[in-house]
Swiss-Prot record:
One GO term (biological process): L-leucine biosynthetic process
Reaction(s) catalysed by this chain's protein: (2R,3S)-3-isopropylmalate = (2S)-2-isopropylmalate
Species of origin: Pyrobaculum neutrophilum (strain DSM 2338 / JCM 9278 / NBRC 100436 / V24Sta)
Protein name (record): 3-isopropylmalate dehydratase large subunit
Pfam family membership, one: Aconitase
Binding-site residues for [4Fe-4S] cluster, renumbered to this chain: 295, 353, 356
Keywords from the UniProt entry: 4Fe-4S, Amino-acid biosynthesis, Branched-chain amino acid biosynthesis, Iron, Iron-sulfur, Leucine biosynthesis, Lyase, Metal-binding
Pathway named in the protein's UniProt entry: Amino-acid biosynthesis; L-leucine biosynthesis; L-leucine from 3-methyl-2-oxobutanoate: step 2/4
């Protein structure tokens, strides 16, 4: 019987490919953002008449340079807007709309979809069981014009998740645990398929975090096998009915088991995503700035946890909080999370990638220590090359903001 990866490709190709095969696939969705969109459209222009295969299958979002921090960024946005208007693309999200990956997850991604976008964290949509894969500008331009592009069929790797999250542990810690076990290139050439033993114990927001950070693991894709949580999410968020197919277990090149109860809050210390330690091992490291947000941890439950911690007082470190989409921002406001964060001294804004890539809205200075819920911590990632970046879950990040140093977040989540 097929694995989930094989099942998706069989439906697309009408045949069963083997790992390593180079195949042409018709995508269900193609996306790009402001930082990559300029290059995508340049390539599209070089191919002759500027046109797309299906306007309804294209998603464009301004997120990396949003709102534009430089004149050049503003020029890029003007250029992209002109093309979006000329092409008549309906799924366009201008400044304030949110981060591309979150928008795709909220509004468009479906189980069994094949999604290609011009960004490495396209994998995020694997949270709902889509084969979502990042590509370069040339390949995305070809997909936009021709309605198809090539992909190497990855080998399937199975991960079984058992148990429930203990207090203070979140999807980010599952991702960091996998990075510690397999390294930053451990899943190169693999499509990771995650089976959750107790689906309701692993919410969609946490699934999105793990899928997002599979990029850091080298995975071509990471997909949570659709279950009742997937179906509930699609019904609640979009009013779409979905019944997960019943598949017999397929054959995997390897497998690994994660026991959630055995995990604790983790951090990735400078300067590598797989330099993973328990948060308690680095307690006391003084922190200058905290960032809660990004396509990794900018969802509603992330801000609920951050608010639970920061309601205890005013942050001692600079704190920047950025919901990943307008929808998350609005809901966080309605539930009072934004009020708690601003009272704690956090600077809050609409969805932007700015601090994550060291572009704007929170660039780190020389020697500064940053705790962030984003996905990368190599030298210079969030600003000055002499800054130090720790990756953490939202509870750990919020506790670091509150105390001005890294601490174990679990005591701060007690009632």
């Amino acid at each position: 019987m097929p694995t989930w990866t094989e099942y998706i490709f069989q439906r697309k190709l009408g045949r069963a490919p083997s790992p390593g095969d180079v195949v042409e696939v018709v995508p269900d969705l193609v996306g790009f953002h402001d930082l990559t969109g300029y290059h995508v459209l340049e390539v599209l222009e070089s191919m002759g008449k500027v046109e797309v295969f299906d306007k309804g299958r294209v998603v464009v979002a301004f997120d990396h340079l949003s709102p534009p921090p430089t004149q050049r960024a503003a020029e890029i946005m003007v250029y992209i807007r002109k093309h979006v208007k000329a092409l008549g693309l309906p799924n366009f999200y201008d400044v304030g709309g949110g981060i591309l990956h979150q928008i795709i997850l909220e509004k468009y991604a479906m189980p069994e979809y094949v999604i290609f976008a011009a960004d490495s964290h396209t994998n995020t949509a694997g949270a709902v069981g889509a084969f979502a894969h990042g590509m370069g500008a040339t390949d995305i331009a070809a997909a936009l014009k021709l309605g198809r592009t090539w992909v190497v069929v990855p080998a399937p790797f199975r991960v079984d998740v058992r148990g429930e999250f203990p207090p203070g542990v979140m999807g980010k810690d599952v991702a960091l645990h996998l990075l510690k076990q397999f390294g930053a290139e451990g899943f190169n050439g693999y499509s990771v398929e995650v089976f959750v033993e107790r689906p309701k114990a692993f919410p969609m927001d946490d699934r999105a975090t793990v899928a997002n950070m599979s990029t850091e693991m080298g995975a071509d894709a990471l997909m949570f096998i659709p279950d009742e949580v997937t179906a509930d999410y699609l019904q609640r968020e979009r009013g779409v009915s979905y019944k997960p197919p019943s598949l017999e277990p397929g054959r995997y090149v390897d497998r690994y088991e994660v026991e959630l109860q055995r995990l604790e809050p983790l951090v990735a210390a400078p300067y590598s995503v797989d330099n993973v330690k328990a948060a308690r091992e680095v307690e006391g490291v003084e922190v200058d700035q905290v960032f809660i947000g990004s396509c990794t941890n900018g969802r509603l439950s992330d801000f609920e946890v951050a608010a639970r911690v920061l309601k205890r007082g005013r942050a001692k470190a600079r704190c920047i909080a950025i919901p990943a989409s307008y929808a998350v921002f609005r809901r966080a406001m309605e539930l009072g999370y934004i009020d708690v964060l601003t009272k704690a001294g956090c600077v809050v804004t609409y969805g932007t990638c700015g601090p994550c890539l060291g572009g704007h809205f929170g660039v780190a200075g020389p020697g500064e220590v940053v705790v962030t819920t984003s996905n990368r911590n190599f030298k210079g990632r969030v600003g000055h090359p002499d800054s130090k970046v720790y990756l953490a879950n939202p509870a750990t990040a919020a506790a670091a903001a509150l105390e001005g140093k890294i601490v174990d977040p679990r005591p701060y989540l007690a009632p």
